[in-house]
C-alpha cells in the first residue's frame, strides 16, 4: 500500500488484505444499490414521458425521494409465509436470485486497472455465475407450493437457459477477436487497429465487425433478465406475477433488486465487450470511467424504451426466436469470424 493507506494497512497488519477486499466490495455494492433504486425512478419517468405523462413527482423535489419511500414501505411490510410453503426454501429463493447478480461484478473493469478481481478467466467466470440466477427463481416457484409461481418458475428456467446459449456463442466471437478471457484485455484490444490510428476509435470497437452478435447479445440480455417484451415469466394476464405471487415485503423487494441489478450488469457488460468500455470514441478525447457510464446509461435506455414500446411476446414465439433464429445465427457467425480472422482480409491484422 502506498500513500495515505499505508498507516491503515499497518494498523490492521496481516488482516489488511481481507479488510481491503471487503472495502472494495462495499465500494461496488453500495453505489450499485443506489443505482438500482434510482433506475426504478428513471424507468417510471422515462416511460411516463413516452406516454405523455409526468411520472412520480410528489415525494421530494421532482419525485427524487420516491425510491427511498418505496424502499421504506417494502422494508416495513410483513413477510407473509403461505401455509403450505416450504419456509426455508421460500426465504432462500430471493437470496439465490440476487447473489449471482452481485458476485458477477467482481470481474467487471470500470477503468484501466480499476477492477475488484483481475481474473484471467473473467469471461468464463461471468458465464458460470450468471447461469446460476435461474436457480433462485426455480426454488422460489417450487417452495411457494402454488400453481402460478410454479408455472412462472418453469417459464423462467426455459427462457433463461435458452437465451444463455446464444449469449455464450456471442461471447465466443468476442473471445476469438480479443484472444483473451480477461475483460480488461478485451477492452484494451478494442483500442487498437486501423480505425483507432485514424482517430475514429469507435469504429475499432467490437460492435462493428460483430454487429449481428452485438444485436443478438443485447436482445438475449433483455430476455435473460425477463424484461419486456420477454416478461412472460410474470405475465399479469396469465399467471399474475409468476414466481413472485406469494412474496411480500423485503423478500419481494429482493427479486426486484435482482432484476434491476441484472439490467445494469447486462448493460455494462455490453459496453465492455462491444462498445470499448472506458475507451474514448475519438482520439482527441481522453479515456475514462465517464465513457463507460455514458455507454451503460445508453444501453439501459434501450431496456426502458423496449418496455414502453413493444407488446409482450407470446411464450412460444420467445422460444422459437431463441432456438430457431438466434442459435443458428450465432453458430454461423462463430464460423464466419474464425474464417475471417485467418483470411488476408481480416481487419484485425
From Swiss-Prot:
Pfam families: NADHdh. Its EC number is 7.1.1.-. It catalyses: a quinone + NADH + 5 H(+)(in) = a quinol + NAD(+) + 4 H(+)(out). It is a multi-pass membrane protein. Keywords: Cell inner membrane, Cell membrane, Membrane, NAD, Quinone, Translocase, Transmembrane, Transmembrane helix, Ubiquinone. The keyword Disulfide bond does not apply. Its main location: membrane. One of its GO terms (molecular function) is NADH dehydrogenase activity. It is found in: Cell inner membrane. One of its GO terms (biological process) is aerobic respiration. PANTHER family: NADH DEHYDROGENASE SUBUNIT 1, NADH-UBIQUINONE OXIDOREDUCTASE CHAIN 1. NDH-1 is composed of 14 different subunits. Subunits NuoA, H, J, K, L, M, N constitute the membrane sector of the complex. NDH-1 shuttles electrons from NADH, via FMN and iron-sulfur (Fe-S) centers, to quinones in the respiratory chain. The immediate electron acceptor for the enzyme in this species is believed to be ubiquinone. Couples the redox reaction to proton translocation (for every two electrons transferred, four hydrogen ions are translocated across the cytoplasmic membrane), and thus conserves the redox energy in a proton gradient. This subunit may bind ubiquinone. This is NADH-quinone oxidoreductase subunit H. It comes from Azoarcus sp. (strain BH72). The gene is nuoH.
Amino acid at each position: 500500500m502506498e500513500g495515505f493507506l499505508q498507516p491503515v494497512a499497518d494498523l490492521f497488519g496481516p488482516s489488511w488484505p481481507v479488510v481491503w477486499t471487503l472495502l472494495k466490495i462495499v465500494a461496488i455494492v453500495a453505489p450499485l444499490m443506489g443505482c438500482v433504486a434510482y433506475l426504478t425512478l428513471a424507468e417510471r419517468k422515462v416511460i411516463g414521458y413516452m406516454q405523455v405523462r409526468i411520472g412520480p413527482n410528489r415525494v421530494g423535489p421532482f419525485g427524487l425521494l420516491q425510491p427511498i419511500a418505496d424502499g421504506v414501505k417494502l422494508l416495513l411490510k410483513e413477510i407473509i409465509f403461505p401455509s403450505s410453503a416450504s419456509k426455508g426454501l421460500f426465504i432462500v429463493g430471493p437470496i439465490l436470485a440476487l447473489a449471482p447478480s452481485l458476485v458477477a461484478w467482481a470481474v467487471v473493469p470500470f477503468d484501466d486497472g480499476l477492477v475488484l478481481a483481475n481474473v484471467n478467466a473473467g469471461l468464463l467466470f461471468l458465464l458460470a455465475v450468471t447461469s446460476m440466477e435461474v436457480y433462485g427463481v426455480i426454488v422460489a416457484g417450487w417452495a411457494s407450493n402454488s400453481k402460478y409461481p410454479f408455472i412462472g418458475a418453469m417459464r423462467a428456467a426455459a427462457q433463461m437457459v435458452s437465451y444463455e446459449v446464444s449469449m455464450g456463442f456471442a461471447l465466443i466471437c468476442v473471445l476469438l477477436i480479443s484472444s483473451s478471457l480477461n475483460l480488461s484485455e478485451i477492452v484494451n484490444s478494442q483500442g487498437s487497429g486501423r480505425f483507432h490510428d485514424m482517430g475514429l476509435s469507435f469504429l475499432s470497437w467490437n460492435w462493428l465487425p460483430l454487429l449481428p452478435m452485438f444485436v443478438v447479445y443485447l436482445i438475449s440480455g433483455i430476455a435473460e433478465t425477463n424484461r419486456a417484451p420477454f416478461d412472460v415469466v410474470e405475465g399479469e394476464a396469465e399467471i399474475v406475477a409468476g414466481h413472485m405471487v406469494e412474496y411480500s415485503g423485503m423478500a419481494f423487494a429482493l427479486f426486484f433488486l435482482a432484476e434491476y441489478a441484472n439490467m445494469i450488469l447486462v448493460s455494462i457488460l455490453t459496453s465492455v465487450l462491444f462498445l470499448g468500455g472506458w475507451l474514448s470514441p475519438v482520439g482527441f478525447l481522453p479515456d475514462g470511467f465517464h465513457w463507460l457510464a455514458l455507454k451503460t446509461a445508453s444501453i439501459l435506455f434501450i431496456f426502458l424504451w423496449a418496455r414502453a414500446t413493444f407488446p409482450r411476446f407470446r411464450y412460444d414465439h420467445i422460444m422459437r426466436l431463441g432456438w430457431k433464429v438466434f442459435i443458428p445465427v450465432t453458430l454461423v457467425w462463430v464460423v464466419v469470424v474464425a474464417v475471417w480472422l485467418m483470411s488476408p482480409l481480416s481487419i484485425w491484422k
